Every structure is written in structure tokens, then in C-alpha cells.
């Protein structure tokens, strides 16, 4: 892998990188202060910068063609450009993300207990309904009960990660447990009598346990990804688990698997806490702080802790400019968008692009 370019405008740790769902030439990045920057990947400069939240942004997604963000300031927001059109209070006592399913279902840590789950439905006219409240996954697994609403102090610790694979919602916990849940959304039952009157019976949504794995126990889950339609997970140790049958365990070179990126369903790109990235035989190392035993420590060494990774895949180049500017834009865009690019965020606020 070779370095292509670096994006620099954040002054705080990068917490999320999200390719724009509406433009292949744009990119969203977020940091630990709640700042979001929309980038033009051709000019490699910010297009829009706004203070979306007052604390770390944990998630970025899309719902009904609008940007959705989730922060440790206990809010989930939906945006029309930089205007917030909907705000949902949430519990962000942990560092878990949120997940959007079927473009209208939102899975979040529960507002009552961040160790549990809430399920919401958001319609295209921005009506909010809580379908399932404070579901305790631990009880669901241990008791084998299918239920709609329950709360308890018995659990697997805080929720660390949520990830969707083939309509199964995987939840990774502080304990190291991973639970796969299927969301059942029954259709209303319509009954008719002889007078042509209709009775509509709404059935309650349910979460059903489809998978449970404890290989990572007692180490917290810190990364989840998809590989060949199968869940892949990493923890604070040097172990990556591919959740196929039978389960495959891969020992890696370092502890702290911060990020796992699926590359073309052929290989995994692994990013570690210490800033190192590994892909096949390729290794990228970044400087990290060193502990010294004397008073003349070199404090000038830059901290390059890796915080986030995502893959930018080639897309068709589009341009709205004309003349020489259009030609220049197409040439630069072609260089970016015909190459698989790994975008890596670091604690110092930089985003580095590597050619894969």
C-alpha cells in the first residue's frame, strides 16, 4: 500500500469516516468534539464544516436519503445539509454505534439502560415510534425467552458494537460475548366479518436470538465487520474471529484490533491501536509514544494512534463544471476513483489515504 494524500482540517481525534451516499466525490468525517466536515475528494478541501454535536460522534449513517449522526452528547440527529430536521434523545454512556435497518428501523443502546437495546421506526415524514424498549439481550440468551420489552441488571456489560450482516443484528459486549438477533416485524392481521367490517390486529415486533459466541470472553469487543457475508470480530487482544461454521480464529501480531476492513471479500485489512496497518504482506507503521526511564525524554515524537478505517471504492466520475476546469476535475477525479483507497483516521485529526 502506498500513501496517496492526507486530509487535514480536524484538530481533534477522528471518530468516523463516511463516504457520501449521494455523491461519489464527497466524504464526511467526524471528530471527538462533534465537528463534521464534508470534503470534496477532487480538490481535497472542505466544502462544509459544522458543529453537529457537543461531544464525540460515534455513528454516521443514512436514513431516507438523509445523513444520520449519533453522539456521546446523548442525541441522534438527522440532517438536511447542515440543518437538523430531527433530534432523538439517546443514552450514550458507552461508545457503541447505532445501526439503520431497511432504511427506517433504528437500533440503539436503550435510553433507560445502555447495556440493553431500543428499536425505533422512523417514517419518511419523520414520525418516530419506539417498537421495542429496553430489551435485555443477556436474559434473552440465558433464558431462551422471546419477548418484546424487559429490563434487568443481569447482562453482558455495556454494548460496545452493533453490526448488521444479512439482516442479523450482531451485538458485541464488554464481556466479549457476541449475540446475533433477528428482528421480526409481523404484518397486521386483517379480519373481516359478514358486514364487511374490518378488524386490524397489530402484532408486537420481536427480537429472536439466532447466534451466541463467547470466544472473545473476557475481552471487550472493539471491532466488527463483514467478510464473505460472515461476521468478523476483534477485541482488545490479538485475536480475530471469523464467525463461520466451524468458527475460525486468527492470531495477529498486536493486541487491540481497532478496525477491520473487508477488501473485495478476498482479504482483511487490519488496523491496530498502535497505528500499525496490515494487509497481506503489506505493513504500515506509524510513530507512537514511547515510555522512557530518564528525565530527558523526547516528547516531540508525534502520536499516531489509529482511530478509524474505511474503504473508498471506485465510482463513476461526474462533473458539473465546464471547459478547462471540467477537464482538470475529471483527470484528478479519475486518479482517485479508479483506485481502491483505504481512508485511515488518526488521533491527531489527520485522515490519510492509502492506495490498496
UniProtKB/Swiss-Prot annotation:
Q: What Gene Ontology cellular component terms go with this record?
A: nucleus
Q: Does the keyword Repeat apply?
A: yes
UniProt-recorded name of the protein: ASTRA-associated protein 1
Pfam families per record: WD40
Provide the alphabetized UniProt keywords: Chromatin regulator, Nucleus, Repeat, WD repeat
Q: Transmembrane ranges? A: none
Q: Where are the WD-type repeats located?
A: 9-49, 52-89, 210-242, 243-283, 317-356
Biological role stated in the UniProt entry: Component of the ASTRA complex involved in chromatin remodeling.
According to the record's subunit comment, the protein's assembly and interactions are: Component of the ASTRA chromatin remodeling machinery complex.
Q: Name a biological process GO annotation.
A: chromatin organization
Q: Which family does it belong to?
A: Belongs to the WD repeat ASA1 family.
What the entry lists under InterPro entries is as follows: WD40/YVTN_repeat-like_dom_sf, WD40_repeat_dom_sf, WD40_rpt
Tell me the Gene3D superfamilies matching this sequence.
Answer: YVTN repeat-like/Quinoprotein amine dehydrogenase (2.130.10.10)
The cross-references to SMART domains, in alphabetical order and at most eight, read: WD40 (SM00320)
Q: Is Repeat set as a keyword in this record?
A: yes
The places in or outside the cell where this protein is found are: Nucleus
Amino acid at each position: 500500500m502506498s500513501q496517496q494524500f492526507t486530509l487535514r482540517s480536524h484538530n481533534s481525534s477522528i471518530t468516523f469516516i463516511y463516504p457520501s451516499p449521494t455523491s461519489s466525490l464527497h466524504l464526511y468525517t467526524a471528530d471527538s468534539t462533534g465537528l463534521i466536515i464534508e470534503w470534496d475528494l477532487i480538490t481535497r478541501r472542505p466544502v462544509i464544516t459544522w458543529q453537529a454535536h457537543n461531544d464525540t460522534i460515534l455513528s454516521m449513517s443514512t436514513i431516507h436519503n438523509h445523513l444520520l449522526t449519533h453522539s456521546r452528547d446523548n442525541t441522534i440527529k438527522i440532517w438536511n445539509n447542515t440543518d437538523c430536521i430531527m433530534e432523538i434523545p439517546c443514552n450514550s454512556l458507552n461508545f457503541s454505534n447505532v445501526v439503520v435497518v431497511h432504511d427506517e428501523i433504528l437500533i440503539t443502546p436503550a435510553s433507560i439502560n445502555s447495556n440493553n437495546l431500543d428499536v425505533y421506526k422512523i417514517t419518511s415524514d419523520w414520525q418516530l415510534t419506539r417498537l421495542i424498549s429496553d430489551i435485555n439481550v443477556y436474559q434473552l440468551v440465558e433464558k431462551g425467552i422471546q419477548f418484546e420489552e424487559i429490563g434487568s441488571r443481569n447482562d453482558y456489560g455495556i454494548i460496545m458494537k452493533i453490526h448488521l450482516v444479512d439482516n442479523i443484528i450482531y451485538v458485541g459486549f464488554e464481556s466479549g460475548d457476541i449475540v446475533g438477533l433477528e428482528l421480526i416485524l409481523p404484518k397486521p392481521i386483517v379480519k373481516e366479518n359478514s358486514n364487511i367490517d374490518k378488524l386490524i390486529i397489530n402484532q408486537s415486533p420481536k427480537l429472536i436470538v439466532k447466534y451466541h459466541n463467547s470466544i472473545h470472553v473476557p475481552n471487550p469487543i472493539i471491532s466488527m465487520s463483514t467478510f464473505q457475508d460472515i461476521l468478523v470480530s476483534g477485541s482488545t487482544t490479538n485475536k480475530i474471529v471469523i464467525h463461520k461454521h466451524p468458527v475460525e480464529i486468527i492470531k495477529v501480531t498486536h493486541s487491540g484490533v481497532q478496525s477491520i476492513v473487508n477488501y473485495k471479500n478476498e482479504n482483511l485489512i487490519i488496523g491496530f491501536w498502535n497505528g500499525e496497518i496490515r494487509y497481506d504482506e503489506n505493513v504500515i507503521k506509524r510513530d507512537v509514544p514511547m515510555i522512557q526511564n530518564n528525565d530527558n525524554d523526547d516528547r516531540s515524537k508525534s502520536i499516531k494512534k489509529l482511530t478509524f478505517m474505511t474503504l473508498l471504492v471506485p465510482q463513476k466520475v461526474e462533473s458539473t463544471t465546464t471547459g478547462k476546469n471540467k477537464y482538470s476535475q475529471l483527470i484528478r477525479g479519475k486518479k482517485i476513483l479508479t483506485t481502491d483507497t483505504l481512508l485511515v483516521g488518526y488521533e491527531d485529526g489527520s485522515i490519510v489515504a492509502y492506495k490498496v
